[in-house]
Amino acid sequence: MDSSPVTYSGEPPYKLRRLSPSYPYVSKLRERCASKIETLSEGSARDSLEEEDVSEAMATGAFLATRLYLPSVLPQRITTLTFLDHFKKSRPLPNSDKRLNPIFYRLAYIRDLVGEMELEGIVERGTASRLLGASSPAGFVAGTYTHARDLSKTMSLASVRDAVLAIEAQTRDQSESQLWALLRRGLATASTMKWGALGPQYHPQWCEVSTNAKGIPNNPALQFGQTNERTARSLISALYVARSEAATPDLLVDPGCGQCFVFDESASVPGDAYACGLLMDARTGVVGASLDMLVCDRDPSGVLSPHSTQTTLDFFEIKCRAKYLFDPDLFSPVATAYANLLKHRTAVCLRKFLRSIKNPAVEYFASTSVPGATEALITCNSSWKPREVNETNRRCGDFDRDHIALNLDASSDVWLFSEPDLESETITPARWDTGELALSVPVFANPRHPNFKQILVQAYVLSGHFPDHQLRPFLVTFIGRHRKRCEEGKTFTICDRPEGSPYNLNEVVHSSCAIPILLFVTPVIVDREGCWEDIEIESLTAFNKTADAIWDSDSPADVSEPTSS
């Protein structure tokens, strides 16, 4: 076999076709964002993988055979093992002024949880210790209680990050995974945080509230969102994310029959390939977030692993608005407004369609006032001012006001979709009267809305794992309609332009999903420097208060030397 190095294109595996560094931002914000975002070299970089590196990667045996596996469906006994119950069995360190980083209490719980799975026989022996980076994984022993103090002495920052990212890879089914639901209990999220005038705050009983929280409510609006989220992901994948012409191998190996490329199997369906599991804050282990869509490569084990030339991570929070759902065959204000929008394809008709319901998805507020907290999308552009405006004397704190100013100059892309082609079974975006496929409108994300806070927390958590990458979050708003009788039971493939052919046959609108009408893609700008430290400090403070409440002052401390992180 030729011993010369095997090379492959160093071009990143994913590129955003239409989200360039300066778009869709406008005004002064465009210049600032453009200056912050690093651009890739126009020349194609070349990387190489030496045979000796391949041998080292395979030295421990067949790497695919040792891929970590954690089940999504759990026995009833396992589902009752919560972080809070595990933490209540811990003990304070000898010197109360020296505390462990809470991440080690979280990982100690996860190790024992996976250990119980070993005892149940639903995962391989040694999985618990292998998850936490043990060089010689050993089987879990019944009755074991892992002390956070011990982990803090043996785990490096790299092994902590690896363990947290491995958990993310095993929980990508999100709400369909019992493991995802169990690990979220006892984690702080954007919804369990309180947001005061100066930023994030914690409820005194935040851990108890999170642990005892009921499951996701089963109402029509949420059902609509869960059903159509994958359609929105496919639309984003088709309209914004393009695979590079030369695919990037996750690992190049020689299994004995010649060199070959090995790719992450989960990436075979692009929309689902970008789905994320539960990400825990690598800084503290207190905060958790689950992203709807993250444009990032994964290694052969399914773990997030940005390509070496990828400097920007784009992620999307998807919201499907059920309140616009209508039957196109019935005469109604929404159906009429939609017919006019599809006929004329103007910004005026777009505004009329959005206002065809009682509470439009875009709220107008005067530039001298502040928006409410009801709608996730807002505008203060005079062309969007309705005939009747209720004047209010709303107030908001500095935290929200600063973020309103930061997002004020941002604009949204709006995509309008043609009626499905029943013969070719495709759906394509329609051109607006301007000739554009994506109409830029002066609509931005509302910092007072829970969706904005959710994205802010997601960005904070993600930044802890990839601190050297520029983050670009977007809020995606999907609006769809009921199917006509002739459309029922059909799966439609998405084209990225009217005259184009399907770019990827896996980017589809499934038969159970609504027919897409509109897609808003809105950039979200957060004050990274002002937020990250606040969230981290508040998280540590909240955890320490919870620990103090649990640990009685007379409880016997561990006899070992205290460890601080």
From Swiss-Prot:
Top class in the EC scheme: hydrolase
GO molecular function, one term: DNA binding
Cellular compartment(s): Host nucleus; Host cytoplasm
Sites marked Required for function: E229, D292, E317, K319
Keyword Hydrolase: yes
GO CC terms in record: host cell cytoplasm; host cell nucleus
Enzyme Commission identifier(s): 3.1.-.-
Pfam family, one: Viral_alk_exo
Keywords assigned: Endonuclease, Exonuclease, Host cytoplasm, Host nucleus, Host-virus interaction, Hydrolase, Nuclease
InterPro entries: Herpes_alk_exo, PDDEXK-like_dom_sf, Restrct_endonuc-II-like, Viral_alk_exo
Domain of life from the UniProt record: Viruses
Keyword ATP-binding tagged: no
Location, primary (coarse class): host cell
Family: Belongs to the herpesviridae alkaline nuclease family.
Database matches in HAMAP family: HSV_AN (MF_04009)
Subunit structure and binding partners: Interacts with major DNA-binding protein; this interaction increases the nuclease processivity of the alkaline exonuclease.
Task of the protein: Plays a role in processing non linear or branched viral DNA intermediates in order to promote the production of mature packaged unit-length linear progeny viral DNA molecules. Exhibits endonuclease and exonuclease activities and accepts both double-stranded and single-stranded DNA as substrate. Exonuclease digestion of DNA is in the 5'-> 3' direction and the products are 5'-monophosphate nucleosides. Additionally, forms a recombinase with the major DNA-binding protein, which displays strand exchange activity.
UniProt protein name: Alkaline nuclease
